[in-house]
Amino acid sequence: MYLARDCPSPKWGASILVAMKIAAPWLLAAAAGLALALAMPGPGLTLSAILFPGLLLEAIERAPGRWRPGFLGWIAGTVFWVVTTNWVIPVMHDHGGLPQLAAVGCLLGMGAYLGVLWGFAAGLAAALPSGWRIWLFPVALIALGVLPRFPPYGFTWTGIASAFIDWPWLAASLPVWGATGLGWSVVAIGAGLWGLIRTETRIAGASALVVAGIALGVAILMSPAVVPTGEPVTVAAIQPGTSLEEKWDPSQSRAIAERVWSMTAAAAVQGADLVLWPESAIPYNLENDATYREMVESYARELDVEIVLN
């Protein structure tokens, strides 16, 4: 038997809808940061980079006000940085000796600190009507995204363009307009798609897509062809495959250095003119250790090769 009392209360259903409406902008903002993080090398879901501008713009659209758009941008940026740089936890905990909670706190603090720039970009964009927001947001985000290259940040990783490093036809445009130009086109295309699906911003969205598409096409067409110049140089890029556990173990320092020396000597025997050592190839600081720096220089002269570090 079906009784009226078995039906959900209309007030209960209305409360759920209200809660969902309140939560939606914050969930969309978090999804925006996650979408871009998943596009980065590693996860490699490249096309999700196109989604993040629309998700964040929709979050801003659903939460008008003076401060909320900025907070939404900050949430999106924080999620992006926390997911993208999650390696901070094992580095600080497993190898740096910090307690697990302290390592998590370092990651969250760094993500929140870097996410502030996203908050500024979202706040600036929200100051304009939706149609103009499509144009301003990509410019604001990319312009503010340049700041981490300088103090007090000094953090140059995970630019938007790095999501497309495995797309040679896009990477070919970098000599024309750099990672800044490519990153802007990605954000502008994503913002344009968001505008295109909304009735009131359809013209602005279509216009942004056309402009970004033309700019991208011109940059690709203007890309300089690869033309050999000068004498050919044989380059050896060595990869010793040293694990983090080994790098942070002082007892392994000598073995790591000997492995790099051995690979460098083998490359020289095979005719290499230039040998590239990866970042932190050896557990010594050549800038502060004059004795070891002299050893590297002497070894390079002995092998008759140029050694390029980092």
Where are these regions (language model features)?
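Short, Lys/Arg-enriched N-terminal segments with co-localized hydrophobic residues
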Residues: 11-19
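Soluble catalytic regions of membrane-associated enzymes that act on cell-envelope
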Residues: 222-310
